[in-house]
Amino acid sequence: MGDRGSSRRRRTGSRPSSHGGGGPAAAEEEVRDAAAGPDVGAAGDAPAPAPNKDGDAGVGSGHWELRCHRLQDSLFSSDSGFSNYRGILNWCVVMLILSNARLFLENLIKYGILVDPIQVVSLFLKDPYSWPAPCLVIAANVFAVAAFQVEKRLAVGALTEQAGLLLHVANLATILCFPAAVVLLVESITPVGSLLALMAHTILFLKLFSYRDVNSWCRRARAKAASAGKKASSAAAPHTVSYPDNLTYRDLYYFLFAPTLCYELNFPRSPRIRKRFLLRRILEMLFFTQLQVGLIQQWMVPTIQNSMKPFKDMDYSRIIERLLKLAVPNHLIWLIFFYWLFHSCLNAVAELMQFGDREFYRDWWNSESVTYFWQNWNIPVHKWCIRHFYKPMLRRGSSKWMARTGVFLASAFFHEYLVSVPLRMFRLWAFTGMMAQIPLAWFVGRFFQGNYGNAAVWLSLIIGQPIAVLMYVHDYYVLNYEAPAAEA
């Protein structure tokens, strides 16, 4: 606050009358004085005493505080310009911790300790002498070698572009069909093991698709340069690789293990491996893996089991209650999974391989539209879709709406592929959920903006996923437990 008497030039004598020659300047001076605080006396009295170190004027020091009000808005009013709500945010965090602590204690009292790390092994192996899922992952190398051999022959002209395209299409189709057939036919493979094997083959499919596209672009550029009578610049930069020198097993397998789906001849590389950074990421991976397993066994499984009877009885009020009860642990586990995969795991792999591009996610939590969320929460997949699906469709004359719909259609197919095949049942809930993102994106973009749009995105994430989980669990329970019991 300070001493107002020393900060303003002291006025002596009386003020000019409003009927005198003061005019607008005098009026402006009165407004400034009123906003500044207490006024001096009409006859040039001394200003009010300076406040003490606590910001209050001395008690009993006089009666100079003739005015204590000024024109101002309440802090919660939008016109106040106040934006520091850190204390309220801390209060929300405290309330969230307390409410979830109560739920955790209630769960322990009701069910006891259900966490069993040994039980997790049975999710991956049904028969200790039969390991079909790891064998499927190892067999994926055959498809990688096949794609490499096709590219080697295309580079030297031993195959025509049409023959190479046909071989690549057959190889890519087999990558998706072969593991699905094994999962559906081999009884000893578990749903979790099937999911991991199919995810490995799906990632390989996307990587080899990109590998084929980029090498094809390089051949076109080389042919175009040759037809124009130009020589390819091989000395553009030191330590860079040009086509076809990139066609080596070392280059291929670096790409297959790198945390990206888009192939390049020269990836950005970090100068060294940071051991402390790598150790932190590995510890995070171990900790969050155990945390996710514990939350699923202790919190989600009992909730899902208790949701079967309301579904069977079609008790809609109880179904909604179970859905909301499942939404909290499901969303918490999904957030932990996001951090575990996109920050801990991918950064650990990138650090080991000195892979320089670490943009695996953007600020999707600030999404004010559904479209922004899908563009920023999974950057490796988003880059692949834009580079190898969206832009090629635009170049072939498709509209932006058609290209965007095509991207969601492909995403819906892979979501259904990764859920229905391991569960050995086809209900299209995942496919429908992904395709529903198109009208949802339009609805949120049309009727919600700013914070309301962000709240709508969060609501769709919190409620949408548990609906799909309950649908699949209910159908799986009916198919594998109720139907055999009824037949018996």
Swiss-Prot record:
Pathway: Lipid metabolism; glycerolipid metabolism. Residues 1-83, 157-161, 224-273, 354-399, 448-449 are cytoplasmic. Pfam families: MBOAT (PF03062). Changing V469A: Slightly decreased diacylglycerol O-acyltransferase activity. Residues 354-399 are annotated as: Intracellular loop 2 (IL2). One of its GO terms (molecular function) is retinol O-fatty-acyltransferase activity. The record marks E416 as: Important for catalytic activity. Residues 1-57 are annotated as: Disordered. A motif (FYXDWWN motif) lies at residues 360-366. InterPro entries: Diacylglycerol_acylTrfase1 (IPR027251), MBOAT_fam (IPR004299), Oat_ACAT_DAG_ARE (IPR014371). Its EC number is 2.3.1.20, 2.3.1.76. The disordered N-terminal region is required for the diacylglycerol O-acyltransferase activity and may regulate enzymatic function via its interaction with the MBOAT fold. This is Diacylglycerol O-acyltransferase 1. It comes from Homo sapiens (Human).
